Structures are given as C-alpha cells and as structure tokens.
Amino acid sequence: MQAQLPLLPITEATHDVLIELIYSSADNFTGRAIYEHSLCFLHPQAEACLRKAVAAARELDLRLKVLDAFRPQEAQEALWAVAPLPGYVADPAKGSNHTRGVAIDLTLVAADGQVLDMGTPVDTMTAESHHFYAGHCAAVQINRARLLTVMLEAGFLHHPQEWWHYQLPDANKFPLIDSHAFMTCVAQDKTSPATRAV
C-alpha cells in the first residue's frame, strides 16, 4: 500500500493562486537558484487554511501570490550559509517552519494583475520589513493590513519581522519533513498533480 504524502501540492489551477517561488530562480538574496524545481507543497492543515485565505482575498477582489511554502532542509541550510540572521532566517539546526510545511510566504495581487506595494521586497532583513513599521506610507500600511486580515481570518499567524511570512499556530510542534524521502514519494505518486513536473 502506498504511503499517504505528508504534504499536499499547491498549484495555480487547483487553488486559484499565483505561484512564483523566489528560490527557484537567482532573483533572491543569495543570488542563485536554491531549488531544483518549482513545486509548491503545504501540510494538509496549512493547505486548508490557504483555501480559506484565497476565499477571503477574493472577497476583497484580490488574489494571493505564493512566493515560498515547503522548503527542503538543504535549501534552509543554503539560506543560512549566506545570511545566518536569527529572526529573519531560521537556524537549520533548529529547523524552519517552512521545512515542516506549515509556513508560507506570499503577497497580494490586485484585479489588474499588479502586485500590491508592501514597502519592501520579500527577504528584506531590516526594520522596514517588520509588519507594523511606522515609517511606511499609509498605502503600504493598508496593503499589509489587508494581507494580515486575510491570513488571520484563515487561521494563520503572522511573523512580526516579515510582512510576507505566515504560519500555523504552534508551528514548531509539527515534525520536520525529510525532503529526500518526500520527493521520492511524490515522484512515485501517480495521482499527484505535481508528479508530471518532477
């Protein structure tokens, strides 16, 4: 009997989101692609909350753009090697909530396709990226508040220092996912929407 996958695939077609994983290209703070693929996964509980967030955003005539979700341990190690900054980058020795599949990085997109101005790019590791940084203009603060409202209503918690990062409550109680074993299961799972991309 085939084991059930510990994470669920997130796709634009199945979840009505936009997906642009920032670590699948060199356009991130490391200057190189960290992922070998562009597959997006979440823990089932986080996936259920994401669906609620999608519905909440739709009521505001907005869409969610997913920038990162499940992150393999080796990817976390690569990020830490470049920026060992607790509070912004999780120490891989302790484990990232992304590696548990219960954290997601994302932003909002307007009906015209424009990404809302959040004041800083993702992975800006300064005070300006903090959720309630007072130095941003009113429009930026409103946009961040919209994202916060959508995600809190869906059951996520925010990261005080990263406006883009949300995670399940008690996230660190979830087990870390063995990425090699997981991706092997994905490749073998003929029913997974992600299988064709592996």
Show the residue positions of the predicted features:
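Extracytoplasmic cell-surface/polysaccharide-interacting catalytic and binding patches
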Residues: 1-69, 81-198
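Segments that shape or occlude catalytic/ligand-binding pockets
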Residues: 72
